[in-house]
Amino acid sequence: MIIDTTEVQAINSFFRLESLKEVYGIIWMLIPIFTPVLGITIGVLVIVWLEREISAGIQQRIGPEYAGPLGILQALADGTKLLFKENLLPSRGDTRLFSIGPSVAVTSILLSYLVIPFGYHLVLADLSIGVFLWIAISSIAPVGLLMSGYGSNNKYSFLGGLRAAAQSISYEIPLTLCVLSISLLSNSSSTVDIVEAQSKYGFWGWNLWRQPIGFIIFLISSLAECERLPFDLPEAEEELVAGYQTEYSGIKFGLFYVASYLNLLVSSLFVTVLYLGGWNLSIPYIPVPDIFEINKASRVFGTITGIFITLAKTYLFLFIPITTRWTLPRLRMDQLLNLGWKFLLPISLGNLLLTTSSQLLSL
C-alpha cells in the first residue's frame, strides 16, 4: 500500500498538533501552581526590602544600596548566599527532627495562603471554614519549631522551642476569639463572605470600626504569633544566642528566615481581609469612579484592581509591625504570658460576648 506524500504530511501535522495540545495543557496546569509561588516570593522580597529601608530611616543611617537599584535585590543576594552555604548537622542531635523542623514551619504557613482572597473571586480555596482553617494550620508551625529545638541537642535551642510553643498557645486563643467575633458579625466563616459583608456599608462598614477592641487584640496576638518585637523571646539574641535557630546554617536557616516573613505577610493579609475591607476601595468623602467598582468592571481589570487594593492595604499595615520593632523593648517571659492569659484572653472573651449580644438583639 503506497501512502501519498500529502497524507504523510497530514498525519505528521496531526500528531504535532496533538503534542502541542499536550504541552499547552501541561503549561496551563502549572500556571495556577507557579503564579502564587512567584507572587508570594516577590511579596516576601518586598517586605524584607521595606523593613531594611524603614529601619535605616528610623536609625538615621543608609540602608542597602549596592545590590540592585535602591538595594531591592539585597534579600535575593542573601538568599543566594545561604543556598551555597554548608549544611551542618549537630553530631549528637536527632538529625531527622532537625531536618524536618524547618520544612514543617514553612509548609504550614504556605498552606495558609489557600484561603486568602486577593480579589473578587480570586482565592485558591473558598471554604466555609476559611478563617478557622487558617488558625488550625498556623498552629502546626510551633510544632516544627519545637522539633527543631529538641533535635538540635542544644539547651538554647530547646529553650527557644519551648518558648515558641508556650507563646503560640498563649496568644492563639485570643486570636481565635477575635476571629470568632468577626464570623458572628459577618454570619460566615468564609474569607470571601467576610469581605463582602464589609462592602455593604462602604468605608464605615469595615470591621476596624465595628470591632475596634478585637482589632487591637488581633494586632497584638498576630505580632506574638509572628514572634516580632516585643514578642521575639523564642530567638532573643541576648539570652538564647538565636533560640531554635542556633544550630542551623545554610538553606535550613534560610527557611526559618523566610518563614518569619511569610508569617508576617499572612498576618497582614488577614488583617486586610478581616478588618480593612479586603479588595474593596472605599474612600470616604471622595467620589470613586465606576471603573474602580469591582463588580461593574471587566473581569481582568477587576481582578488586577482587587489585587492592587489588597496588597496596598497590606503593605501600608506592615508599617506598624516594622516600626514597632524599633520602638518597644522586649518583654520578659512572665510579662508575655501574663499579657496573654490575664489581659487579652478576658478582654477578647468579653468582646465576643458583646458581639453575640448585639447580634441577638438585632434579630
Curated annotation (Swiss-Prot):
GO terms under cellular component: chloroplast thylakoid membrane
The Gene Ontology biological process annotation of the record reads: aerobic respiration; photosynthesis, light reaction
Q: Which residues cross the membrane?
A: 30-50, 104-124, 127-147, 253-273, 300-320, 336-356
Which reactions fall under this protein's catalytic activity?
A: a plastoquinone + NADH + (n+1) H(+)(in) = a plastoquinol + NAD(+) + n H(+)(out); a plastoquinone + NADPH + (n+1) H(+)(in) = a plastoquinol + NADP(+) + n H(+)(out)
Citing just one GO molecular function, the answer is: quinone binding
Q: What class of enzyme is it?
A: translocase
Q: How does it sit in the membrane?
A: Multi-pass membrane protein
Localization (cell) = Plastid, Chloroplast thylakoid membrane
For this UniProt record, give its keywords in alphabetical order, as a comma-separated list: Chloroplast, Membrane, NAD, NADP, Plastid, Plastoquinone, Quinone, Thylakoid, Translocase, Transmembrane, Transmembrane helix
Please give the chief subcellular localization of this protein.
plastid
Domain of life per record: Eukaryota
Summarize subunit and interaction data from the UniProt record for this chain. Answer: NDH is composed of at least 16 different subunits, 5 of which are encoded in the nucleus.
Q: What does this protein do?
A: NDH shuttles electrons from NAD(P)H:plastoquinone, via FMN and iron-sulfur (Fe-S) centers, to quinones in the photosynthetic chain and possibly in a chloroplast respiratory chain. The immediate electron acceptor for the enzyme in this species is believed to be plastoquinone. Couples the redox reaction to proton translocation, and thus conserves the redox energy in a proton gradient.
What NCBIfam families does UniProt report for this protein, alphabetically?
A: PRK06076.1-2 (NF004741)
Would you identify the family this protein belongs to, as annotated? Answer: Belongs to the complex I subunit 1 family.
Q: State the protein's name.
A: NAD(P)H-quinone oxidoreductase subunit 1, chloroplastic
In which organism is this protein found? Panax ginseng (Korean ginseng)
